Each structure stands twice: as structure tokens, then as C-alpha cells.
Amino acid sequence: MARKCAICGKGVQMGMQVSHSHIRTKRTWSPNLQRVRAVVKGAPVRLNVCTRCLRSGKVQRSV
């Protein structure tokens, strides 16, 4: 699935962009996703993983 972490499920968040004159328009915040090769059930698989999961060691990367 696009723009979603395969480990924790973190995805896009919606909100408003507020200008100086308080005009509000919709905008999105995307998670920092990296496409990595990870070991899943003993086989290397390409996954979209957020950087928080990478830094915390929730992903075992393949070489």
C-alpha cells in the first residue's frame, strides 16, 4: 500500500495549512518512508518502512 509503513502502519495525516491572513486550505503530512530490503520469514522482501521503525530496530535488513 502506498504511503504507509509496512511495520507500524503509520500513514498520511490530513490537516489545514493556515496562512498569515488565516485562510485555511487542506494539506497532507506524509511519513518519512524508505524502501528497504528486509528479511521476512527467511526471505528478502522489499518494504516501505518509516524511519522510526528503521532506527528502533524493528526491521532486520538483508544484505
UniProtKB/Swiss-Prot annotation:
Protein's name in the database: Large ribosomal subunit protein bL28
Lineage per the UniProt record: Bacteria, Bacillati, Bacillota, Clostridia, Eubacteriales
NADP in keyword set: no
Native source species: Heliobacterium modesticaldum (strain ATCC 51547 / Ice1)
Any GO BP annotation: translation
Presence of the UniProt keyword Lipoprotein in the record: no
One Pfam family this sequence matches: Ribosomal_L28
Record key words, sorted: Ribonucleoprotein, Ribosomal protein
GO molecular function, one term: structural constituent of ribosome
PANTHER family, A to Z: 50S RIBOSOMAL PROTEIN L28 (PTHR39080), LARGE RIBOSOMAL SUBUNIT PROTEIN BL28A (PTHR39080:SF1)
Family of the protein in this entry: Belongs to the bacterial ribosomal protein bL28 family.
GO-annotated cellular components: ribonucleoprotein complex; ribosome
